[in-house]
Amino acid sequence: MPKNKTLKRIVRIPLTTIVAFLALAIGLDSLRAANTDLTLSAAVSLKDALDEIVHLYGVEHPGVTVHSNLGGSGTLQRQIEQGAPVDIFISASPKEMDLLESQGLLLSGTRKNLAKNSVVLIVPAGTSQISGFSDLVKPAVKFIAMGEPQTVPAGRYAQEVLTHLKLYDQLKSKLVLAKDVRQVLTYVETENADAGIVYATDAKISAKVSVIATAPQDSHSPVLYLGAVLKNSVNPAGAKAFLDFLAGDKARGVFEKFGFVTIRD
């Protein structure tokens, strides 16, 4: 009998310990979600909307600090592939997200469609020599700014538009390629380019440019913003909570205020 009693004690102690550890793990997971730093790598075209959304999230979750790393989606994708410590990634096209997913770098089940955009042709405010895409071939138009198609989704969409309109080959010598869509906007604002191709939301935030034309929807791939948690996130619970907020009603309201078309899955 003493042996049996001893055996029962030996069995009970590990079970109790396991339960305690499980409770502690669950508690720590919730604590990390509520108190943490998160790194968000996102397409720079989202800057103004994300600034406001991050602020709103901080008000509701004062223990969380979201650090934004903004740039061209292709550049951010390569940073992640090279091991950059990122918790959440938002790209301006499916291509970059697909590449990361194919390499197993996304946390399974976290990928979300967030918003849509459109592609527009802009000129410096007050310019009258350009009234549409076809005017870009005029000799007076010397420089046309667009994103680098290999790394900037906005540049890839711009290339698709010009190709669809049978203008790309004629305009190659005039193209000024930028590192991201906000640099395109700056080139046009400062009149270092006669025209530029950006997202509608970029044009909306600047009083220094005018929208001359919107690219036909069938002239380019859909402009789709997607978000996902990275598999190597040090705090997946916190990252998931922020991504859920991005897909929620409050964030949708901000996206729509800045001209994005939101998606309700």
Language-model segments: residues:
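Exported/periplasmic ABC-transporter solute-binding proteins
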Residues: 13, 26-61, 65-70, 74-84, ...
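Bacterial N-terminal signal peptides that target proteins for export
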Residues: 3-18, 27
